[in-house]
Amino acid sequence: MRKIIHVDMDCFFAAVEMRDNPALRDIPIAIGGSRERRGVISTANYPARKFGVRSAMPTGMALKLCPHLTLLPGRFDAYKEASNHIREIFSRYTSRIEPLSLDEAYLDVTDSVHCHGSATLIAQEIRQTIFNELQLTASAGVAPVKFLAKIASDMNKPNGQFVITPAEVPAFLQTLPLAKIPGVGKVSAAKLEAMGLRTCGDVQKCDLVILLKRFGKFGRILWERSQGIDERDVNSERLRKSVGVERTMAEDIHHWSECEAIIERLYPELERRLAKVKPDLLIARQGVKLKFDDFQQTTQEHVWPRLNKADLIATARKTWDERRGGRGVRLVGLHVTLLDPQMERQLVLGL
């Protein structure tokens, strides 16, 4: 049985700012773009979250909720330096590390001899070491598979951890809401609830064939997760090549104005996700995806050096006009392709 730890730093960007400037510790702060430039919030500290300020929220809305919010532009070199230090701490316990972004990672400690081989004690020690060396707090989840470790890391935030032992998995899954499973969004959750499926326990009683007919490939993933099955390895060679966000509509859309409104809502989340893996927002390409009512889909990309909403909207409009052919649209997606590390190095050297 594997021992997987998911470590997730607590409001990472904001925590670095509070550490380096103690005057910020007890006031609401957020990292994000200015209201004048229609920026979005990347992360907010816990005092700001009490006012409802959240990641991916437009800055203007955040300032309405919390007029005395201190807005910071971000110091991404400082965040990258802290992230590298955290990753070095991970490497003291295992070489099997899969970073997901600057502030979270999976660790496979199945074969680790540290702390007498106890994943629970390793997670505690890692969190304490991060605090001792960086004065930052982390939360952790421990479980026999990746998706449960990720869910567990959110159970006792901030500055806590939650353990799901192999023996506890069946009982934990029985009452686990399907919306907690990574990949189950609001639309999917609503469709599942309409089928009478609210928890993993409900899905365990459902015929796999029904899920496959209703959700396709995702139906199998959902069924497996509800059984506690997740065979994905912690991949230390993992190199993220793209970042995306998409929305499946409850009803097909037929007007460009509807599509544009969805893009406006998706863009802040794309920006937030990209900032977690690429704080400078430099990219190789960006593009859009449309899926039609006949389940055919099309994508269109442009070479573009930095995330740009106006270009994404223009690309989507061109795709809508040229490829829709009168069909309804059931899914809208935005994505970026990241720079190859070698190409990025050449760009930096050329500056």
Curated annotation (Swiss-Prot):
<dbReference type="GO" id="GO:0009432">
    <property type="term" value="P:SOS response"/>
</dbReference>
<feature type="binding site">
    <location>
        <position position="103"/>
    </location>
    <ligand>
        <name>Mg(2+)</name>
    </ligand>
</feature>
<protein>
    <recommendedName>
        <fullName>DNA polymerase IV</fullName>
        <ecNumber>2.7.7.7</ecNumber>
    </recommendedName>
</protein>
<feature type="active site">
    <location>
        <position position="104"/>
    </location>
</feature>
<keyword id="KW-0234">DNA repair</keyword>
<keyword id="KW-0963">Cytoplasm</keyword>
<dbReference type="InterPro" id="IPR043502">
    <property type="entry name" value="DNA/RNA_pol_sf"/>
</dbReference>
<feature type="domain" description="UmuC">
    <location>
        <begin position="4"/>
        <end position="185"/>
    </location>
</feature>
<keyword id="KW-0460">Magnesium</keyword>
<comment type="similarity">
    <text>Belongs to the DNA polymerase type-Y family.</text>
</comment>
<dbReference type="InterPro" id="IPR050116">
    <property type="entry name" value="DNA_polymerase-Y"/>
</dbReference>
<dbReference type="Pfam" id="PF11799">
    <property type="entry name" value="IMS_C"/>
</dbReference>
<comment type="function">
    <text>Poorly processive, error-prone DNA polymerase involved in untargeted mutagenesis. Copies undamaged DNA at stalled replication forks, which arise in vivo from mismatched or misaligned primer ends. These misaligned primers can be extended by PolIV. Exhibits no 3'-5' exonuclease (proofreading) activity. May be involved in translesional synthesis, in conjunction with the beta clamp from PolIII.</text>
</comment>
<feature type="binding site">
    <location>
        <position position="8"/>
    </location>
    <ligand>
        <name>Mg(2+)</name>
    </ligand>
</feature>
<keyword id="KW-0479">Metal-binding</keyword>
<dbReference type="GO" id="GO:0000287">
    <property type="term" value="F:magnesium ion binding"/>
</dbReference>
<dbReference type="GO" id="GO:0006261">
    <property type="term" value="P:DNA-templated DNA replication"/>
</dbReference>
<dbReference type="GO" id="GO:0003684">
    <property type="term" value="F:damaged DNA binding"/>
</dbReference>
<keyword id="KW-0548">Nucleotidyltransferase</keyword>
<dbReference type="GO" id="GO:0003887">
    <property type="term" value="F:DNA-directed DNA polymerase activity"/>
</dbReference>
<dbReference type="Pfam" id="PF21999">
    <property type="entry name" value="IMS_HHH_1"/>
</dbReference>
<keyword id="KW-0227">DNA damage</keyword>
<dbReference type="Pfam" id="PF00817">
    <property type="entry name" value="IMS"/>
</dbReference>
<dbReference type="GO" id="GO:0042276">
    <property type="term" value="P:error-prone translesion synthesis"/>
</dbReference>
<comment type="subunit">
    <text>Monomer.</text>
</comment>
<dbReference type="GO" id="GO:0005829">
    <property type="term" value="C:cytosol"/>
</dbReference>
<keyword id="KW-0238">DNA-binding</keyword>
<keyword id="KW-0515">Mutator protein</keyword>
<feature type="site" description="Substrate discrimination">
    <location>
        <position position="13"/>
    </location>
</feature>
<keyword id="KW-0239">DNA-directed DNA polymerase</keyword>
<dbReference type="InterPro" id="IPR017961">
    <property type="entry name" value="DNA_pol_Y-fam_little_finger"/>
</dbReference>
<dbReference type="InterPro" id="IPR053848">
    <property type="entry name" value="IMS_HHH_1"/>
</dbReference>
<dbReference type="InterPro" id="IPR043128">
    <property type="entry name" value="Rev_trsase/Diguanyl_cyclase"/>
</dbReference>
<keyword id="KW-0235">DNA replication</keyword>
<dbReference type="InterPro" id="IPR036775">
    <property type="entry name" value="DNA_pol_Y-fam_lit_finger_sf"/>
</dbReference>
<dbReference type="InterPro" id="IPR022880">
    <property type="entry name" value="DNApol_IV"/>
</dbReference>
<keyword id="KW-0808">Transferase</keyword>
<dbReference type="InterPro" id="IPR001126">
    <property type="entry name" value="UmuC"/>
</dbReference>
